[in-house]
Amino acid sequence: MSVLTPLLLRGLTGSARRLPVPRAKIHSLPPEEKLGIMELAVGLTSCFVTFLLPAGWILSHLETYRRPE
């Protein structure tokens, strides 16, 4: 590394340290109506089918996906 490399890097990052970081203005209200059992069941089932079912299929059929040696 060159002798000037730390000076160049310090010059590049020095101005970024002085920039103010804006805070997010997130305000939320309470829900208008509570979720029922049916909505929760449909939501959890759709998450399971979307994410876990394909991963389980691939893991259970891993031997068929491997290349023959």
From Swiss-Prot:
Residues 61-69 are mitochondrial intermembrane. The keyword Mitochondrion applies. Pathway: Energy metabolism; oxidative phosphorylation. The lineage of its organism: Eukaryota, Metazoa, Chordata, Craniata, Vertebrata. Keywords: Membrane, Mitochondrion, Mitochondrion inner membrane, Transit peptide, Transmembrane, Transmembrane helix, Ubl conjugation. Belongs to the cytochrome c oxidase VIII family. Disulfide bonds: none annotated. InterPro entries: Cyt_c_oxidase_su8, Cyt_c_oxidase_su8_sf. This is Cytochrome c oxidase subunit 8A, mitochondrial. It comes from Pan troglodytes (Chimpanzee). One of its GO terms (cellular component) is mitochondrion. Component of the cytochrome c oxidase, the last enzyme in the mitochondrial electron transport chain which drives oxidative phosphorylation. The respiratory chain contains 3 multisubunit complexes succinate dehydrogenase (complex II, CII), ubiquinol-cytochrome c oxidoreductase (cytochrome b-c1 complex, complex III, CIII) and cytochrome c oxidase (complex IV, CIV), that cooperate to transfer electrons derived from NADH and succinate to molecular oxygen, creating an electrochemical gradient over the inner membrane that drives transmembrane transport and the ATP synthase. It is found in: Mitochondrion inner membrane. The gene is COX8A. Pfam families: COX8. The chain crosses the membrane at residues 37-60. Residues 26-36 are mitochondrial matrix. The keyword Methyltransferase does not apply. A motif (SIFI-degron) lies at residues 2-19. Component of the cytochrome c oxidase (complex IV, CIV), a multisubunit enzyme composed of 14 subunits. The complex is composed of a catalytic core of 3 subunits MT-CO1, MT-CO2 and MT-CO3, encoded in the mitochondrial DNA, and 11 supernumerary subunits COX4I, COX5A, COX5B, COX6A, COX6B, COX6C, COX7A, COX7B, COX7C, COX8 and NDUFA4, which are encoded in the nuclear genome. Residues 1-25 form a transit peptide. One of its GO terms (biological process) is mitochondrial electron transport, cytochrome c to oxygen.
